[in-house]
């Protein structure tokens, strides 16, 4: 169980590092009363190898995407979109980050969308919904360090998340090629969704020594 917790926390933190980009944009919007000047420059500085794109969606409509090239189809009305509308409205109405996916990106890669709702205050001190700051995380790139270590140490693993905030059904985000026999798991929450990380040695659980030894490398 310790080993699942150790890796599970690492994976959670790797995903959180991507989500921090939406928080950074959110703070700029709040401080600048809903405006971001030089969005492309800011987004470029926030990008990393595990990020597919950074987006702004005032009133829930995606208007700005970095990088713009190849992402023109991403400019959609999230609130009224048949695949994204319900979960986007949930994020807006419940003041919570949502993660949706994985879904196929261009070149056959996969991604997870993180939508972070932003609220501003009008002249009457009334809060209103500005829109979303968004980042598309590449899968499995966002947790590549963890899965590289897992593979090196001879583990099979599975990362999954609930399909939506109101669902108990888990959807696989990424998994190793082999089967999982009697896996131990670690559950964690990101935004409004529950995530689960499962792990088992490729050779099976012989004894507790293996768990203790491998855990020691990451404490």
Language-model region placement:
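Juxtamembrane extracytoplasmic/periplasmic/luminal helical "stalk" adjacent to the first N-terminal
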Residues: 1-34
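Membrane-interface helix-start motif
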Residues: 146, 198-218
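Broad hydrophobic/π-residue packing in well-ordered secondary structure
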Residues: 8, 18, 42, 193-195, ...
């Amino acid at each position: 169980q310790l080993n699942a917790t150790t890796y599970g926390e690492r994976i959670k933190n790797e995903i959180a590092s991507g989500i921090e980009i939406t928080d950074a944009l959110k703070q700029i919007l709040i401080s600048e009363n809903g405006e971001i000047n030089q969005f492309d420059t800011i987004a470029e500085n926030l990008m990393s190898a595990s990020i597919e794109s950074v987006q702004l969606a005032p009133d829930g409509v995606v208007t700005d995407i970095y990088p713009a090239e190849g992402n023109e189809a991403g400019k959609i009305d999230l609130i009224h979109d048949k695949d994204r509308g319900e979960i986007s409205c949930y994020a807006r109405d419940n003041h919570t980050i949502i993660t949706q996916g994985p879904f196929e990106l261009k070149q056959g890669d996969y991604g997870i969308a993180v939508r972070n709702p932003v609220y501003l205050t009008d002249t009457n001190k009334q809060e209103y919904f500005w829109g979303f700051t968004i980042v598309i995380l590449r899968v499995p790139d966002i947790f590549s360090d963890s899965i590289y270590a897992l593979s090196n140490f001879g583990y099979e693993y599975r990362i999954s998340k609930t399909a939506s905030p109101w669902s108990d059904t888990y959807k696989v985000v990424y998994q190793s090629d082999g089967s999982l026999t009697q896996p131990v798991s670690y559950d964690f929450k990101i935004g409004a969704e529950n995530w689960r990380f499962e792990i088992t040695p490729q050779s099976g659980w012989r004894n507790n020594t293996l768990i203790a030894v491998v855990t020691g490398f990451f404490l």
